[in-house]
């Protein structure tokens, strides 16, 4: 993987990730949003439909794909690309976040994490080395190191110990990744909770090890938005400029805009797909809750400015009807729209950076939403 930085507008960055795959060269234009395909599928969508929304890269979930279908079945197909028939780039998380979300079902040690399989109850063990092996079998184009996602709230001492262990796990992840002869990309994950000095130590340690990109982890885990913004404003300028920056598990449309304002290049989140299945649809001027009775006889399209299959062909009344009847097509049409909304948003962001009018775009974006622009505490780097 290569990262090419074309242009900046303030702290916002316009570039691309370039991947050499057996099927050819693939570019992922950045800033980019990655739809989440937890179990090897973006829920309800074929790969062709996901691609039609504008997606150029997907996220797969190492933890869930390890438990089902498992490494052996994955190897029999070739890798995850062959299994799910998505032959463009795939990023896989390390499994760390899912393991740590198990709470009392898991026990963390220096070696790794012992936990109870949520599917069948058996006790299993995941380590940095095992995570690298699973992701190697998945054929991930971007592999994430195994780390501990520091919870919120956490004391300074806990966040420090957690971050230091994640750094030791980062070294082990790097070593096993290299032993496997993996030629794809490996990203480090910056931890440290809401404490700036810990984030700095984490980043410096990761840079010393050396990675192809750097993710900001341990945010969007319940902390106030102000803390997320503060940490991003503090740490992003310190990440090597020639490496991509990935904000994990984020988020709402405004979170993407705020991340880009602070120098982030990559995002992922289940929000557009999960919200779609619950009738919560993103449109140019905010949100449409399609289950609201006022849409029962609304013959207008969901979003007149959207060019997705759903908006070009169906009315709000039809989407309301499908939802009320519990029809699968309703969830699918909603998902197509929400994914397209996110990709259109990213395309608009990229164009605004290219045109050096990103600040104006931010003002217009919030004006359409009827919201004030959140303050940016750091002086823009021009």
Curated annotation (Swiss-Prot):
MF-aspect GO terms: metal ion binding; tRNA-guanosine(34) queuine transglycosylase activity
Entry annotated with the keyword Metal-binding: yes
Cofactor note: Binds 1 zinc ion per subunit.
One GO term (biological process): tRNA-guanine transglycosylation
Region spans: RNA binding: 249-255, 273-277
UniProt entry keywords in alphabetical sequence: Glycosyltransferase, Metal-binding, Queuosine biosynthesis, Transferase, tRNA processing, Zinc
Positions that bind substrate: 93-97, 147, 191, 218
Active site: 93, 268
Pathway(s) it belongs to: tRNA modification; tRNA-queuosine biosynthesis
Main function: Catalyzes the base-exchange of a guanine (G) residue with the queuine precursor 7-aminomethyl-7-deazaguanine (PreQ1) at position 34 (anticodon wobble position) in tRNAs with GU(N) anticodons (tRNA-Asp, -Asn, -His and -Tyr). Catalysis occurs through a double-displacement mechanism. The nucleophile active site attacks the C1' of nucleotide 34 to detach the guanine base from the RNA, forming a covalent enzyme-RNA intermediate. The proton acceptor active site deprotonates the incoming PreQ1, allowing a nucleophilic attack on the C1' of the ribose to form the product.
Protein name (record): Queuine tRNA-ribosyltransferase
Organism of derivation: Haemophilus influenzae (strain PittGG)
